[in-house]
């Protein structure tokens, strides 16, 4: 059967448009569903279905569309978005391939990657060693430009897509204002943060690192036991106050893309008072070199951040509090958080090398989503992955 691809919502960039063009150039049928004016702005390839109704009616709309058009594959970005969940359910019922970004069936906690270290020890020696890939330029200003263009176009939604409701918990214009304020805060505190890091490292103060994640991230909202980062910090600081060495400290580093809507210094003061932790045992950073912190940290506590992978690269003891693809015996601490401060162990280096190579080999491509150069790299690498009948992970089974 000739492959027929349906693209749903992608990132706020030309990536899906370029990918659609590439798929079409191979002779495959390509179409897309646009849910808002931003989607329409970034799609110029070919057929586009415009869904203008409320999301409550979307499941039936997908059912009719899938039966009529006989699609073999759907491609989407973000498997928890309300506009995607009914599509995934229908696709799986009809044995339609689901590509979430570049991974079959799901990402993060929905990934098909095994959690059994024995599987990686068996498969690992058969997988080639991967480097960090070819570098590319992708300035943050390009990502910001695409995001703003997407949401400015969205000002037409009330007329063009009256039923659309964003999946984001905070409106874009609110985030933009807060981010400008935070950019000023980062600039003002950069020297202070660097001096604090240097003092901790050169004084050999034992410290544990907590990399913050975004409250809006589906990794927190859908793949963790927490409603937000405050919940995670209350649990972690309470445990640290009770169970850690009294001469150790916590270094808490904010996410580089945090909008600044949360006042973390004030929040941390409140939590310290609540759990009985002295505030001098907390160092909060808005900026600073993460590799330097990872090189010297006694361990890392995260929900399920990609920084967890970096911690494993640096051989740091790691505790994951949420669902993470790297959370398995031999890589992360499997005991409870209270015992981690005293008994956390370094990851198995060989197991991590096999795990990393397998993840790259089966689920990753070299490229990006925002600059022209990085998009071209992504499309070139993605095309053969999308056109195979079996995923690379399935071929290893």
Task: Label every model-predicted segment.
Residues 122-164, 330-397:
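Leloir-type glycosyltransferase catalytic cores
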Residues 4, 72-73, 207, 249, ...:
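Structural motif
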Residues 53-68, 256, 261-307, 313:
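Donor nucleotide-activated moiety binding/catalytic core segment of transferases
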Residues 165-268:
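Conserved catalytic-core segment of nucleotide-activated headgroup transferases in glycan assembly
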Residues 18-28, 239-243:
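A short, Lys/Arg-enriched amphipathic alpha-helix followed by its capping loop at the start of a domain
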Residues 73-85, 286-332:
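A donor-sugar binding/catalytic signature common to diverse glycosyltransferases
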Residues 99-189:
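Catalytic core of nucleotide-activated saccharide and alditol-phosphate transferases
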Residues 7, 12-18, 35-131:
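Active-site and donor-binding regions of nucleotide-sugar-utilizing enzymes
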């Amino acid at each position: 059967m000739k492959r027929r691809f349906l693209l749903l919502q992608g990132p706020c960039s030309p990536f899906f448009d370029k990918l659609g063009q590439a798929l079409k150039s191979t002779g495959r049928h390509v179409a897309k569903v646009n849910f808002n004016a931003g989607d329409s702005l970034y799609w110029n390839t070919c057929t586009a279905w415009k869904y203008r109704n409320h999301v409550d009616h979307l499941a039936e709309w997908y059912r009719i569309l899938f039966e009529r058009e006989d699609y073999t594959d759907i491609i989407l970005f973000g498997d928890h978005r309300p506009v995607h969940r009914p599509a995934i359910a229908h696709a799986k019922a009809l044995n339609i391939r689901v590509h979430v970004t570049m991974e079959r069936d799901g990402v993060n906690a929905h990934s098909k990657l095994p959690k059994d270290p024995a599987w990686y020890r068996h498969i690992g020696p058969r997988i080639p060693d991967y480097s960090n890939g070819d570098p590319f330029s992708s300035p943050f200003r390009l990502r910001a430009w695409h995001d703003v263009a997407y949401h400015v176009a969205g000002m037409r939604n009330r007329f063009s897509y009256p039923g659309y409701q964003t999946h984001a918990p905070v409106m874009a214009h609110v985030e933009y204002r807060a981010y400008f304020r935070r950019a000023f805060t980062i600039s003002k505190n950069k020297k202070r943060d660097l001096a604090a890091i240097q003092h901790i490292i050169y004084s050999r103060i034992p410290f544990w690192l907590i990399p913050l994640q975004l409250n809006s991230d589906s990794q927190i909202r859908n793949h963790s036991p927490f409603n937000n980062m405050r919940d995670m910090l209350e649990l972690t600081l309470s445990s640290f106050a009770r169970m850690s060495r009294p001469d150790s400290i916590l270094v808490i580093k904010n996410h580089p893309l945090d909008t600044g809507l949360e006042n973390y210094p004030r929040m941390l003061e409140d939590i310290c008072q609540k759990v009985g932790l002295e505030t001098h045992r907390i160092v909060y950073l808005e900026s600073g070199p993460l590799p330097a912190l990872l090189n010297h940290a006694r361990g890392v506590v995260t929900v399920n951040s990609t920084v967890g992978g970096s911690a494993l690269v640096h051989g740091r003891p790691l505790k994951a509090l949420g669902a993470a693809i790297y959370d398995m015996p031999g890589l992360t601490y499997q005991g409870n958080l209270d015992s981690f401060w005293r008994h956390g162990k370094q990851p198995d280096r060989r197991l991590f090398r096999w795990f990393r190579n397998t993840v790259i080999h089966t689920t990753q491509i070299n490229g990006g989503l925002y600059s022209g150069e990085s998009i071209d790299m992504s499309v070139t690498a993605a095309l053969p992955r999308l056109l195979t009948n079996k995923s690379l992970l399935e071929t290893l089974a």
